[in-house]
Amino acid sequence: TIAHSGRGICRNAGSNIPWELMPDLYQYTIDRDSTTLWSVDQSKFRPDLTVIYLGANDFSGWMMPDNKKFNKGYLSLLSEIKANYGEEHPILCMTPGPYEFLFLYVRDVVNNCGMKNVYFLGHCPMIHNETNEDLGAGWHPNYNGQLKIAHALIPYIATITGWGLQDVLVK
């Protein structure tokens, strides 16, 4: 898991200064330490799938990022993942939050990236409530919000990977 609050594809939350963006931080073993780059050759772990759930920070503060810059950053991240795990490795690109343009931006990147096994899942704004019921610190989904996202995501992952669905309660 690579996660960092406030980071975006081409613009961080509340800032137009493009520093420490997620495509840059992707290869870091230790957060914000560029001297500790991760290497696929040194790791025995190979994920079955990569899920990208980015973009809300790029649209934060009701600022809309430049489409070309966003596409370039997103393609850079997709290319890094494919370079690490190969063309056959599946990547599911999801859109967080109620941003219609983010949906369009990510869908455009996925549809035009020219890479195999890159999928798009754009969910509606009401995947979780925009209230304390489903959100925690910094407008990030809390346990309840993440559970709702997981329930929407599970069928897509099962289809992409060929995994069967099990009749069990997801907690």
Specify the residue positions occupied by each region the protein language model found:
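Catalytic His-Asp segment of secreted/periplasmic serine-dependent ester chemistry enzymes
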Residues: A13-L21, P96-K171
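Surface-exposed acidic, glycine-flexible loop patches that form ligand/cofactor-binding
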Residues: S34-F45, I81-G86, I160-Q166
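Aromatic/hydrophobic pocket-lining residues that form the small-molecule binding cavity
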Residues: F70, Y74, Q146
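Generic structural signal for well-ordered alpha-helices
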Residues: Y74-I81, V106-R107
